[in-house]
Amino acid sequence: LKETRTDYLLDSRTIKQKVRKVLDGECSFELIVGDSQKVLSDFPDECIDCVITSPPYWKLRDYEIGATSQDMVIGDEGKPEDYVRNLVGVFTQIHRVLKSTGSLWLNIGDKYINKNLMGMPWRVALALQDAGWILRNDIIWEKMKGSLGWTPLSRHENGVS
């Protein structure tokens, strides 16, 4: 039985105070843990220069710690379409808080089901374009480890900027 932790979740007022400290230059960063859409809703528009993120890969990790049965855990959706839709929801908030001169760096992994590559990076990139994002580049991150044995030897992940 896994223990559910909620002591690190912050209320909206506390999040706004932490965001204000960073934006006012009182500190260089602040770690805020919580539901990304809720946390980002407390940020003012166009206040972030750069976002670098690697959201949970679809159906590849168990991030159960801290989640309650009512929580939606990104990466644990039943269908790829639901995963993509949930990510687009988060990135809609990111788009709002990102300055017009800002950049998003997104690292996203893929998944095989029954030896069929799901194309999750492509699905997410196309959905983000449909949501108004501009895709500037597809960056290959060469990794030195990793192969499922029955797949061609591709040791890389897609990054999107």
Predicted regions and their residues:
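Core catalytic lobe of class I
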Residues: L1-S161
